[in-house]
Amino acid sequence: MLERTLRVLEYNKVKEQLLEHTASSLGRDKVKHLVPSTDFEEIVEMQDTTDEAAKVIRLKGSAPLGGITDIRSNVKRAKIGSMLSPNELLDIANTMYGSRNMKRFIEDMVDNGVDLPILETHVAQIVSLYDLEKKITNCIGDGGEVVDSASDKLRGIRTQIRTAESRIREKLENMTRSSNAQKMLSDSIVTIRNERYVIPVKQEYRGVYGGIVHDQSASGQTLFIEPQVIVELNNALQEARVKEKQEIERILLMLTEEVAVEADIVLSNVEVVANLDFIFAKAFYAKRIKATKPIVNNERYMDLRQARHPLIDPEVIVPNNIMLGKDFTTIVITGPNTGGKTVTLKTVGICVLMAQSGLHIPVMDESEICVFKNIFADIGDEQSIEQSLSTFSSHMVNIVDILEKADFESLVLFDELGAGTDPQEGAALAISILDEVCNRGARVVATTHYPELKAYGYNREQVINASVEFDVNTLSPTYKLLIGVPGRSNAFEISKRLGLSDRVIEQARNHISTDTNKIENMIAKLEESQKNAERDWNEAEALRKQSEKLHRELQRQIIEFNEERDERLLKAQKEGEEKVEAAKKEAEGIIQELRQLRKAQLANVKDHELIEAKSRLEGAAPELVKKQKVNVKNTAPKQQLRAGDEVKVLTFGQKGQLLEKVSDTEWSVQIGILKMKVKESDMEYINTPKQTEKKAVATVKGRDYHVSLELDLRGERFENAMARVEKYLDDAQLASYPRVSIIHGKGTGALRQGVQDYLKKHRGVKTFRYGDMGEGGLGVTVVELK
């Protein structure tokens, strides 16, 4: 991108706001070097990455990036053998902890079912150096001091130091507390000079204590003397301190060498956390400006819904819908100055730059944006005093440069095209420049106050007029963009509101040609029609949203009803099974009792009477249980019966064996000790499988009442999407849905084409079509099922 384009579109101001959300100098360095990408795949991945970080912030509120610092120079020094200071080593340990903590944070979210594939890939590159981290923190305290426990030798030396200091203080305090000493000392204190303990002695008593004078007061009346009696003790203390320093240096060198061994891993981890800091800064900034992830396409069109400029307070700015690249490739915004035209122009430019930098943009969901190889902008008054260029000349220098470089992959933004010269010539130049850029296939947004360009949009197929709405009642622009309506000056209406007489205004109208008046009246009617159409659309949109809400509520109630019904059926079935089981047990008991009675010759009971008794008892079983007991394999075509086959006599519910066929429809059947004739229609063939064979058992899948009426495939890879479509259509048919919607987005069109090719071949599909305006348009396919 041209540096001038980034400057006039205030890209660096966006980066300054982004910097406020970084957690470390590592992230800040990434932001400072941020420039828009022109690679489609890279931009899509950056947008997806920012979206994952935004999801983390929505779920967790923040990310644990604290304690991370830029330790790269320290690690590189360790590699070449320089000894690191305690604080430098502590920074390394803290950064290692921060990277390890960040890795655990993301992995825990993934383990809990949050889908973060890109962030998961990032943290997978972090290698835990827990042992090195603990070695450093075990040796260095939070304040940057080497602790006693760093080594046994250091602990012993410091014990000696404390003992020596205690003995020295004790001796000196005894000296200062004596009654004789009071008159010889300037103050009864023990202090330190040149790292040796001393006492403040008056000048005239310097010879009383002997020893060494280390300092004197500003007046010269007080000498700081190390008495002779503690010279040896101070010497011993100094020797211990030298040993302490040597041991500390040994420990620091040892830790530095440990860092040098793992230097490459540490530097790799630093790069990962730098990227994570940068990524989460983007997500926090998106939250700040209420931005969303745009759909990125490679088809050179954009659809910005309710777009806002990120540098203007969202509570103040008026959002606008801006479309470019489908029905028209050029927008010409006409109308008076100070009407918000330049803000609209800059909004388009900065949204494109942000999106191509992986930043979410301040628009509504489902907004689309395309990738431009070049963005050219001629905005503002940039006169060059050194080159003595006028406003017009300055603009023309930029325009000449743009015309040399613009092509079909370019976005060109012109502010007040042709301004600064004779209006008639300026308008003619503006038209020629627009024709030249449009013929190259570039996407163009231009602003102008020349009325001649109002007709330009009507005479060119790929060009559309637009204006910024002006409220005559308040005498101020509303900053609302009106696509398809050219701007008008409103001079007469403003003058009338300010008190100019009707007579003067009418005379002024007479000075304007009839054609001009007709055009102004036509524009006024267009504005009114636009307002009415927008009002109607808003009402329709509100009704659509209300309908969707009612639909979702109805679907929820249907699901709840079906769940409750299924629950009651299961409960009833269970109760029925329990009753049947009880009846069977009772029947078996009765039959057993009757058989025992017959054996005892206490009753003259026949087997067929026993069978009939049991059949009557089983007849009391609930119908649902009988249905449940029918095996799927029995619904197959009727088996060819042969003598010796085992069958079930349905009337009695008993198993029997076929003896011989006595007629076309009857068989002689052996049931226990009883032989009887049974019709084929009253028997069921029992297939007894061989032990060595395994038969496939058919299963019947019930309806799933939790199938959604929509399938969202956006972001899916082609193969995964097709597999999901296949399963979804099967589930929808089982759920008896008459119609479903498949959301594939507009994108490159590959996924949309793949879905519709599949639907053409699916036997369960009756018809399909694109969604209507309220259903998602070309981004949705509505499927009618058989």
UniProtKB/Swiss-Prot annotation:
CDD domains linked: ABC_MutS2 (cd03280), ATP-synt_Fo_b (cd06503)
Entry's EC annotation: 3.1.-.-, 3.6.4.-
InterPro entries per record: DNA_mismatch_repair_MutS_C (IPR000432), DNA_mismatch_repair_MutS_core (IPR007696), DNA_mismatch_repair_MutS_sf (IPR036187), MSSS (IPR046893), MutS (IPR045076), MutS2 (IPR005747), P-loop_NTPase (IPR027417), Smr_dom (IPR002625)
Chain coiled-coil ranges: none
UniProt keyword terms in alphabetical order: ATP-binding, DNA-binding, Endonuclease, Hydrolase, Nuclease, Nucleotide-binding, RNA-binding, rRNA-binding
Molecular function terms, GO-annotated: ATP binding; ATP hydrolysis activity; ATP-dependent DNA damage sensor activity; endonuclease activity; mismatched DNA binding; ribosomal large subunit binding; rRNA binding
One Pfam family hit: MutS_V
Residues bound to ATP: 335-342
Enzyme class name: hydrolase
Domain Smr: 711-786
An example Gene Ontology biological process: mismatch repair
PANTHER family, sorted: OS10G0509000 PROTEIN, OS10G0509000 PROTEIN-RELATED
Subunit structure as annotated in this protein's UniProt entry: Homodimer. Binds to stalled ribosomes, contacting rRNA.
Function of the protein: Endonuclease that is involved in the suppression of homologous recombination and thus may have a key role in the control of bacterial genetic diversity. Acts as a ribosome collision sensor, splitting the ribosome into its 2 subunits. Detects stalled/collided 70S ribosomes which it binds and splits by an ATP-hydrolysis driven conformational change. Acts upstream of the ribosome quality control system (RQC), a ribosome-associated complex that mediates the extraction of incompletely synthesized nascent chains from stalled ribosomes and their subsequent degradation. Probably generates substrates for RQC.
Family: Belongs to the DNA mismatch repair MutS family. MutS2 subfamily.
Official protein name in the record: Endonuclease MutS2
Gene behind this protein: mutS2
